[in-house]
């Protein structure tokens, strides 16, 4: 394997992963308190709108992916999304736990929802909402099934429901982020459960191309341990940026290359060249499709 890129012509645009805040109405066992809580203040809507204005000066089409925390708990979230559409953001995705009513999701002018379905909560109600979005709107939907090792019966049920309803889905192994950020703790799974998870190909359209030939979804790249790009040249910062809940900006969700400054404070600098990956594994599906390749000197070794 020598190069990976997006299946779609996104190389001349920029995708922004924007963590709107740490606030979340869930408290999942595998999500550490350092990245979610129920008390952090919401960022002022005028700061958020000013940030959108700054993104629109990047000189290329902007694709926004809102995450959190839980982005929809921000009291001005709908206003923010409407503003993004008004100023010309080209594509908007929202990653959500799906706990709000169908009417809320259907009312937002977004292009895609990624429903992260957590089996520790009322997943059947969330599935019903997802199914309604698919049946009654034209919004693209992806169901991420968070495969908790103690909830495998529910995981199997939910996967079967998604397949039956033809809802695009991925089965995600849990990464217990309080510990090693590179690895998934497969030892928590029973062997037969782990094998089943690894057999579940994403039914979402493949979004990556490997070596110009193999089309594959980013989640499957991670599942098959093809996500080893250390010492590769990566366009993180060219094709992507990540905004943290406090306005700190990085090249991508992996935070390779360190902080670029703070966009809320007007101090960030946009990179003009690729970065050499220094991570053992690329563990976030959002970062996998970013164009990356083996350096020529590595090919000759």
Annotate the PLM regions.
Residues 48-66, 74-161, 168:
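Radical SAM/AdoMet-radical enzyme domain recognition
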């Amino acid at each position: 394997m020598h190069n990976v890129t997006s299946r779609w012509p996104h190389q001349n645009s920029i995708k922004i992963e924007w963590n709107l805040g740490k606030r979340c109405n869930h408290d999942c066992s595998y999500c550490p308190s350092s990245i979610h809580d129920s008390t952090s203040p919401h960022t002022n809507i005028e700061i958020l709108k000013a940030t959108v204005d700054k993104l629109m000066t990047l000189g290329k089409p902007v694709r926004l992916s809102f995450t959190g925390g839980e982005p929809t708990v921000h009291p001005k979230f709908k206003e923010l999304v409407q503003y993004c559409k008004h100023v010309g953001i080209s594509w908007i995705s929202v990653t959500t736990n799906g706990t709000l009513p169908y009417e809320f999701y259907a009312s937002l002018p977004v292009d895609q929802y990624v429903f992260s379905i957590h089996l520790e909560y009322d997943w059947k109600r969330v599935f019903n909402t997802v199914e309604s979005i698919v049946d009654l709107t034209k919004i693209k939907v992806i169901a991420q099934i968070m495969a908790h090792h103690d909830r495998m019966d529910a995981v199997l049920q939910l996967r079967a429901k998604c397949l039956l309803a033809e809802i695009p889905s991925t089965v995600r192994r849990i990464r217990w982020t309080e510990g090693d950020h590179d690895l998934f703790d497969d030892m928590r799974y029973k062997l037969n459960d782990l094998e089943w998870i690894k057999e579940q190909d994403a039914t979402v359209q493949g979004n990556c191309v490997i070596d110009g030939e193999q089309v594959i979804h980013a989640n499957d790249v991670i599942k098959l341990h093809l996500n080893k790009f250390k010492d590769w040249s990566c366009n993180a910062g060219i094709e992507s940026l990540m905004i943290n809940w406090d306005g700190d900006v990085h090249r991508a969700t992996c935070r390779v290359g360190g902080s670029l400054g703070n966009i809320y404070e007007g101090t960030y600098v946009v990179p003009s060249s690729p970065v050499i990956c220094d991570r053992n594994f690329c563990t976030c599906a959002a970062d996998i499709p970013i164009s990356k390749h083996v350096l020529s000197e590595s090919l000759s070794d």
